Amino acid sequence: MKILVLNGPNLGRLGRRQPEVYGSETLADVEARLQRLAGELGVEVELRQTDAEHEMLGWIHDAADAGLPVVLNPAAWTHTSVALRDACAELSAGLVEVHVSNVHAREDFRRHSFVSPVATGVVAGLGTAGYDLAVRFLAGRVVGGA
């Protein structure tokens, strides 16, 4: 089974953009680690990143149609996109919302998520290890049949 790991705007700059907030690990580093983890768990992961909201919506629609579980770091769209929330509501195989930083300890506007109410779970503030936790959780549901 495949788990999609989808990343929103500015995450292509992970490791370079505000390393004091997001750390020094790049998205390529995260992908390499998740590929190893997926092999251990007996699942496949596919990591994608886009700064274009319409592209993200298309990926989520495709995942919903294919019945795939999704790890999503919506980044700034977390706080702004009803369209993203509505697309995510169609995901039936599981959705874990991930944030590298603790969005609840930052500016007020970052504390609201349009995605959280339709997510299976949320991981925030654990750095890039949040991706690992999300993949482990979804793999357990897939392999365990939950």
Curated annotation (Swiss-Prot):
Pfam families: DHquinase_II (PF01220). Substrate binds at residues 73, 79, 86, 100-101, 110. GO terms for biological process: amino acid biosynthetic process; aromatic amino acid family biosynthetic process; chorismate biosynthetic process; quinate catabolic process. It catalyses: 3-dehydroquinate = 3-dehydroshikimate + H2O. Its EC number is 4.2.1.10. Pathway: Metabolic intermediate biosynthesis; chorismate biosynthesis; chorismate from D-erythrose 4-phosphate and phosphoenolpyruvate: step 3/7. One of its GO terms (molecular function) is 3-dehydroquinate dehydratase activity. InterPro entries: DHquinase_II, DHquinase_II_CS, DHquinase_II_sf. The active site is at residues 22, 99. HAMAP family: AroQ (MF_00169). Homododecamer. Belongs to the type-II 3-dehydroquinase family. This is 3-dehydroquinate dehydratase.
